Swiss-Prot record:
GO terms for biological process: translation. The lineage of its organism: Bacteria, Bacillati, Bacillota, Clostridia, Eubacteriales. It comes from the Bacteria. It is an enzyme of class 6 (ligase). The active site is at K79 (charge relay system), S154 (charge relay system), S178 (acyl-ester intermediate). InterPro entries: Amidase, Amidase_CS, Amidase_dom, AS_sf, GatA. It holds the Pfam family Amidase. One of its GO terms (cellular component) is glutamyl-tRNA(Gln) amidotransferase complex. It catalyses: L-glutamyl-tRNA(Gln) + L-glutamine + ATP + H2O = L-glutaminyl-tRNA(Gln) + L-glutamate + ADP + phosphate + H(+). Belongs to the amidase family. GatA subfamily. This is Glutamyl-tRNA(Gln) amidotransferase subunit A. Heterotrimer of A, B and C subunits. It comes from Clostridium botulinum (strain Loch Maree / Type A3). Keywords: ATP-binding, Ligase, Nucleotide-binding, Protein biosynthesis.
């Protein structure tokens, strides 16, 4: 039995039945990382000793017949912008190279409380800015389905770790599609929860009104398991909602008969690969066969979402990243004459090109004379986009679309074409701007590469997403796919 290919719920079953020890599971994953990660590039840091120590503790509890917790013995990888006490937290940036976190993020605390085994920190686009993980300052992450292709981004390492069987579960962050798009490219399941469903405390900020921590897993049940474990109110993050967290597993098997699904024409227009369109349309038919009522709908302001997103997120990034100045921690240039020179050279040398591009754009739209023309207008557009979604959700339980207009593209193909790279998130960005939840799951294969189906629902309706996603998933075999790597 290859333990690395099993889902979290399968591992839980064999652990509780004492068919395997937590230490065996952990060592199997550490061996897998040592074997393949030099080619896949998922990890920036591996916590081998700590993981084995934690696994032995769990085995001791099992020996005493103590009740297992939600994540007991399950190997988890954490994106390298989420704090784990005692581990590096670099955001895949030279400017934070060598920085070790002195505390746990709220989501990390919850994983530890539920006895998940944290294997290490995962590769990403620098400061979560990118759609291919080519913007990492340290190494490339590659798609397990085809090493010449990108895994998506910015949570590329998180997707690769699960798809490449280097972790059972992982955490990413999603600002404009950074969990869903790599999940689509790598053939796994990824959730962007409602803004405020999961705490951002201890997560390095990119766009504070957009960022959300998102769980990733091999199937829908795994994703639901991790979401239930980490969601909920956090007094250290005032944007979290004081709403009860349901046991999402209970929503999986409910009948979807009578669920109303909208198909927005704006998500099926120009730029969508025809083979991707066909895969998504076939998935919609499966949902219809399972009892859902499918009708067309319209979200007319979606054409403005990408522009609004890049103005708002870049403005927030320019403010959030001002703290990285080479003074208190992180990279400091050695070639400086005075204090001003430290700031200038440390940031110029420490940040990568994409981060600098967004800082400059954000600073520009917040500057006197341009604030009203760009930033203020973008906020107005955002409000209208939210209203658009609210109007549609009065008539529909969910909306279905492609996750990305294409399958995974080749490494280097879009690196120098900024607009083409940004357009790879055209179907995920509107959801982030509105703050509603969405899930991506595999719905087909094109030339050996996975295709992602995106299901979107109203605020705090993650249970609806899991219900519809599970109904589709169990009707097809795509969730059983594993990259032959």
């Amino acid at each position: 039995m290859d333990l690395t290919k099993l889902t979290a719920h399968e591992l839980k079953d064999i652990l509780s039945n004492k068919e395997v020890k937590a230490e065996e599971i952990t060592r199997a994953f550490l061996d897998r990382i040592n074997l393949v990660d030099n080619k896949l590039g998922a990890y920036l840091y591996v916590s081998e000793e700590e993981a084995i120590k934690k696994a032995k503790e769990i085995d001791g509890k099992i020996e005493k017949n103590e009740e297992l917790k939600a994540l007991s013995g399950i190997p988890v990888g954490i994106k390298d912008n989420i704090n784990v006490k005692g581990m590096q937290n670099t955001c895949a940036s030279k400017i934070l190279q060598g920085y070790t976190s002195p505390y746990d993020a709220h989501v990390t605390e919850k994983i530890k409380k539920e006895e998940g085994i944290i294997l290490g920190k995962l590769n990403m686009d620098e400061f979560a800015m990118g759609s291919s993980t080519e913007n990492s300052a340290f190494k490339l992450a590659k798609n397990p389905w085809d090493l010449e292709r990108v895994p998506g981004g910015s949570s590329g390492g998180s997707a690769v770790a699960v798809s490449g069987c280097e972790a059972t579960l992982s955490l990413g962050t999603d600002t404009g599609g950074s969990v869903r798009q790599p999940a689509s490219f790598c053939g796994i399941v990824g959730l962007k929860p409602t803004y405020g469903r999961i705490s951002r405390s201890g997560v390095v900020a990119f766009g504070s009104t957009l960022d959300q921590v998102g769980p990733m897993g091999k199937d829908v049940e795994d994703c639901a398991l991790l979401t239930s474990a980490i969601a909920g109110l956090d007094k250290k993050d005032f944007t979290t909602a004081d709403k009860e967290v349901p046991d999402y597993k209970k929503s999986l098997t409910k009948d979807i008969k009578g669920k109303k699904i909208g198909i927005p024409k704006e998500f099926f227009g120009e730029g969508l690969d025809e083979k991707v369109r066909k895969s998504v349309e076939e998935a919609i038919k499966v949902l219809e066969e399972n009892g859902a009522e499918v009708k067309p709908c319209s979200l007319p302001l979606m054409d403005y979402a990408l522009s609004a997103y890049y103005i708002i997120s870049s403005a927030e990034a320019s403010s959030n990243l001002a703290r990285f100045d080479g003074i208190r921690y992180g990279y400091r240039s050695k070639n400086f004459k005075d204090a001003k020179d430290i700031y200038l050279k440390s940031r110029s040398e420490g940040f990568g090109d994409e981060v600098k591009r967004r800082i400059m754009l954000g600073t520009y739209v917040l500057s006197a004379g341009y604030y009203d023309a760009y930033y203020k207008k973008a906020l107005k557009v955002r409000k209208l986009i939210k209203d658009d979604f609210q109007r549609v959700f009065k008539d529909f339980d969910a909306i279905v679309s492609p996750t990305s207009p294409t399958t995974a593209f080749k490494v280097g193909e879009k690196k120098d074409d900024v607009m083409s790279m940004y357009l790879s998130d055209i179907y995920t960005v509107p959801i982030s701007v509105a703050g509603v939840p969405a899930i991506s799951l595999p719905c087909g294969m094109i030339d050996g590469l996975p295709v992602g189906l995106q299901i979107i629902s109203d605020y705090f309706k993650e249970d609806v997403l899991f219900n519809l996603a599970y109904s589709y998933e169990q009707s097809v075999d795509f969730y059983k796919m594993r990259a032959d790597f």
